[in-house]
Amino acid sequence: MKYAAALTAVAALAARAAAVGVSGTPVGFASSATGGGDATPVYPTTTDELVSYLGDDEARVIVLSKTFDFTDTEGTTTTTGCAPWGTASGCQLAINKDDWCTNYEPDAPTTTVTYNTAGELGITVNSNKSLIGEGTSGVIKGRGLRMVSGVSNIIIQNIAVTDINPEYVWGGDAITLDEADLVWIDHVTTARIGRQHYVLGTDADSRVSITNNYINGESDYSATCDGHHYWNVYLDGSSDKVTFSGNYLYKTSGRAPKVQDNTYLHIYNNYWENNSGHAFEIGSGGYVLAEGNYFSNVDTVLETDTFEGALFSSDSASSTCESYIGRSCVANVNGGDLTGTSTTVLSNLSGDTLPSADAASTSPASNAGQGNL
């Protein structure tokens, strides 16, 4: 009987391992990402084990089947911060990271801030990793993920990253890339984040696809003091190429996205709902092709006062795209001022194989994020 039970247990583990893997294939600029490939799946059980698997030099398929709570793993830090947006209960405060309060908000009242130290810096993710969640069970709480300094070939799918010092700007980012290549982030939910849900830093992030994710900006704390998160998607790279597709951006108030500094963004078939401020902020060096997107109850789709980049976008289907990318571009819905006719954007993307956009819809609201593979 014991022998039979052991065989049954082994068979169950083998079946579980065989069933685990990346679902679907990446689209867009990171279409050739393979992550950990066919490596035998590993199932971390502690935060230390998860950090070790993500940061080592082995090709790995890492499966999350529980919540990994980093909130108290490094204790708390108490220091002097500032209150740039006031001290009302719904307003975020700011940590004085790198003298940010001192240099950029010198007139803001100072205040004492106490935050969870672990959240400040994300977990290092090394090359050739697939990080996959089981069902809706795979959650990283209190700390984000960080892909930097030349890492490549990473897939993150079907997990949630939540609760990173949401009271405090500079409390931590959910997903950080800086000098990373071939990164596919798919069906990830991010919620209650102190700073950016996604940030691509000033070094080149060559081929990145951010698809079918749920950026949940609903929070008790906000820089706009209204329960809508301001810091959402910041693309600040050098020679970056980013595909942003099928994502659901809910209750945001700014930087959704902010694009600048030689970043090429193909942003299509996303859904914005209940944005109390602006969605797009396009600075110098931001090149954006926006098509097939749907906007519902968005106060300002494009921040026109600070616009310095290049945009191709239209509220009606455009055949101008034909001669550059081999097909017509697809109209946005309720795009407001998100109109641009820069053929520089199209010309610079003409050598790339761009996925086709579908007609704009609200489907990401039910299809994006963890648990919706």
Swiss-Prot record:
SUPFAM superfamilies reported in the protein's UniProt record: Pectin lyase-like
Catalytic activity: Eliminative cleavage of (1->4)-alpha-D-galacturonan methyl ester to give oligosaccharides with 4-deoxy-6-O-methyl-alpha-D-galact-4-enuronosyl groups at their non-reducing ends
Disulfide bonds: 82-101, 91-225, 321-329
Residues the record marks as active site: 255
Domain of life: Eukaryota
GO BP annotation list: cell wall organization; pectin catabolic process
Subcellular localization, as worded in the UniProt entry: Secreted
Record's keyword annotation contains Nucleotide-binding: no
Coiled-coil portions: none
Regions of compositional bias (Low complexity) in chain numbering: 354-366
Signal sequence coordinates: 1-24
Keywords of the record: Carbohydrate metabolism, Cell wall biogenesis/degradation, Disulfide bond, Glycoprotein, Lyase, Polysaccharide degradation, Secreted, Signal
Enzyme class: lyase
PANTHER family to which the protein is assigned, alphabetical: PECTATE LYASE 18-RELATED, PECTIN LYASE A-RELATED
Name of the featured protein: Probable pectin lyase D
The organism of origin for this protein: Aspergillus niger (strain ATCC MYA-4892 / CBS 513.88 / FGSC A1513)
